Design a protein with these regions (language model features):
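Conserved beta-strand hairpin/beta-sheet module of binuclear metal-dependent hydrolase folds
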Residues: 1-42, 113-128
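Active-site HxH/HxHxD metal-binding segment of metal-dependent hydrolases
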Residues: 10-11, 24, 31-103, 189
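Core dinuclear metal-dependent hydrolase active-site scaffold
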Residues: 17-19, 92-116, 121, 152
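Divalent metal-coordination and catalytic microenvironments
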Residues: 18, 28, 53, 105-108, ...
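Active-site metal-binding loops of divalent metal-dependent hydrolases
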Residues: 29-31, 54, 79, 108-109, ...
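Active-site-adjacent loop/tail segments of enzyme domains
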Residues: 131-157
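Accessory terminal helices/loops
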Residues: 148-157, 167-250
Length: 250
């Protein structure tokens, strides 16, 4: 039986740790020390690392973790220093007895990857709870295609993104769709969780489809908001581009 633990680091990052009672894999280790403490406290051996993209808050712990474990498999984009199993999407990674489909999801970065083994989706900074990542390298069309690919996963998929941005994302989502009752209900639930010091993650794909404006670019309310903020047509990529630009200055 595998358990999933989010380890908080920095101001709002999580390292995701999937583990049984002997072995663990970790996703996007931005720091080594918190992960080392977690492993030591439970007597776990680190079996593999998965990396979604090259930004330092997702990779800063790689060097220390690998130095202590020569030969440790590190999967991720080729440009990430420390990756020794480079991936581009379309591969399968086997770890902890599970097969993870490697998905190319460009947008936030051009070589961003996600890892899916039901029910878990480790999606880095592509899909957030009620949001999506900034377009640092990719185009709106690429991000729209990537998010559409993820949104097609089963509704019970657990969305394990890397940042605790949920409350700020929900505030923006309500501005986009003020009439969405699911959004109001979700915000109440997530505010209560944060008030108790609990993470809002993982989310579910069904909840994202109901409340995430970037997965709802065909909804009339989202289209209307996008038109009001500069969308020149109603295509999914143009709607996403308009609301993402709005969010960048919200």
């Amino acid at each position: 039986m595998l358990a999933l633990t989010p380890l908080p680091i920095f101001d709002d990052n999580y390292i995701w740790v999937l583990h049984d009672d002997r072995h663990a894999l970790a996703v996007d280790p931005g720091l080594a020390a918190p992960l080392e403490r977690f492993l030591a406290g439970r007597g776990l051996q680190l079996a593999a690392l998965l990396v979604t993209h090259h930004h330092h808050d997702h990779t800063g712990g790689l060097a220390g973790l690998v130095a202590a474990r020569p030969g440790l498999p590190v999967y991720g984009p080729a440009r990430v220093a420390g990756v020794n199993r480079p991936l581009t999407g379309g591969e399968t990674v086997t770890a902890l007895g599970r097969d993870f489909d490697v998905l190319a999801v460009p947008g936030h970065t051009l070589d961003h990857l996600a890892y899916h083994a039901a029910p878990w989706l480790f999606c880095g900074d592509t899909l957030f709870a009620a949001g999506c990542g900034r377009l640092f390298e990719g185009t709106p069309a690429q991000m729209h295609a990537s998010l559409s690919r993820l949104a097609a996963l089963p509704g019970d998929t657990l969305v394990c993104c890397t940042h605790e941005y949920t409350l700020s994302n929900l505030k923006f989502a309500r501005a986009v769709e003020p009439g969405n009752a699911d959004l109001r209900e979700r915000e109440t639930v997530e505010q209560a969780r944060r008030a108790r010091g609990l993470p809002t993650l993982p989310s579910s794909m069904a909840l994202e489809r109901a409340t995430n404006p970037y997965l709802r670019c065909a909804e009339p309310g989202v289209i209307g908001a996008a038109r009001h903020h500069g969308a020149i047509d109603d295509t999914g990529e143009e709607v996403l581009a308009a609301i993402r630009r709005w969010k960048d200055t919200f």
